[in-house]
Amino acid sequence: MQGIIIKGIAGFYYVKVEEEIYECKARGKFRLGELSPIVGDKVDITVINGKGVIEKIHPRTNKLIRPPVSNVTQAFIVFSIVNPEFSSDLLNKFLILCEFNNIKVKVCINKIDLVNEELLTPIKNLLNNTGYELKFLNAKSKIGINELKESLKDNITVVCGPSGVGKSTLMNSIAGSNVMKTGDISEKLKRGKNTTRHSELIEVAGGFIVDTPGFSSLDLNFIDRYELKDLFPEFYEYNGSCKYSTCVHDKEPGCEVKKAVEEGNINIERYNFYVDTLNKLSVRRNYK
């Protein structure tokens, strides 16, 4: 049978197969090798007397480290304009990480009750021509929540963003009573409350949402300098148009991306962040 791991606690994995959930252990070959099952994995299992064994882990489309979860297809990147104050650099880092992991994005601006339309203009300009969906929410009063719920279908969604923007409130508004506290899980599964617990997939609206926020580390050092340009979707239409095929859209003459910035077709703040990140990668990787 094929299913998906929705929970992992102390060496036990809970695999959802259609409408059933099976408690499984992993074959020793996984424990001895470098590949260990994690939440989000698509797996083949055999079940004998109601107990399952994971026989195969299917290839992953991606793997997040914090939290450890695989095959994530969608991210709700949550920010506020005030309380805490919006940071375009921080948002850009989240966007790069999602692009790198091939995760589609919805940028969610929470606490819109605290701002007026004028304060929302900079974020709209920042994301102009990027293709990213921009949603305005008030998670406490559930404004905009239904639309997000509709996008959960057939996705594994992670919620991420800086501290204090209302990620937990948003997740509770979306998942409602489906969200289980650690103690509840421990009681249900008859395991100790201090048992090591990893992420869990909560089933909502025909999809899954990861119950712990994603991307706790925003380090970009692992990205190749020459691949950075591929993580900015507003650059795509200029691929192959620059004078030099190796153009990284920095100081080269005949760069169509720089021309687009000058003409206002690419947001200059996003471009400046790109150049700054490019230069940091150059120094760290000794490309200069």
From Swiss-Prot:
Source species, please?
Clostridium acetobutylicum (strain ATCC 824 / DSM 792 / JCM 1419 / IAM 19013 / LMG 5710 / NBRC 13948 / NRRL B-527 / VKM B-1787 / 2291 / W)
Cellular component terms (Gene Ontology):
cytoplasm
Q: Specify the domain of life of the species encoding this protein.
A: Bacteria
Gene3D superfamilies in the record, alphabetically? Answer: Nucleic acid-binding proteins, P-loop containing nucleotide triphosphate hydrolases, Probable gtpase engc, domain 3
User: Known Pfam families for this protein?
Assistant: RsgA_GTPase, RsgA_N
Q: Which family does it belong to?
A: Belongs to the TRAFAC class YlqF/YawG GTPase family. RsgA subfamily.
Protein purpose: One of several proteins that assist in the late maturation steps of the functional core of the 30S ribosomal subunit. Helps release RbfA from mature subunits. May play a role in the assembly of ribosomal proteins into the subunit. Circularly permuted GTPase that catalyzes slow GTP hydrolysis, GTPase activity is stimulated by the 30S ribosomal subunit.
What are the alphabetically sorted keywords of the record?
Cytoplasm, GTP-binding, Hydrolase, Metal-binding, Nucleotide-binding, Ribosome biogenesis, RNA-binding, rRNA-binding, Zinc
The answer to whether the entry has keyword NAD is no
> Could you tell me what this protein is called?
Small ribosomal subunit biogenesis GTPase RsgA
Cofactor binding note = Binds 1 zinc ion per subunit.
Disulphide bonds annotated for this chain are none
Q: Which residues bind Zn(2+)?
A: 242, 247, 249, 255
Q: Which InterPro entries match?
A: G_CP_dom, NA-bd_OB-fold, P-loop_NTPase, Ribosome_biogen_GTPase_RsgA, RsgA_GTPase_dom, RsgA_N
Q: Which Gene Ontology molecular-function terms are recorded?
A: GTP binding; GTPase activity; metal ion binding; rRNA binding
Lineage here is: Bacteria, Bacillati, Bacillota, Clostridia, Eubacteriales
Which positions fall inside the CP-type G domain? 61-218
Binding-site positions, GTP? 110-113, 161-169
Q: Name one GO biological process term.
A: ribosomal small subunit biogenesis
Q: What is its main location?
A: cytoplasm
Q: What is its EC number?
A: 3.6.1.-
Tell me, how does this one assemble? Answer: Monomer. Associates with 30S ribosomal subunit, binds 16S rRNA.
Protein's cellular compartments = Cytoplasm
Names of required cofactors? Zn(2+)
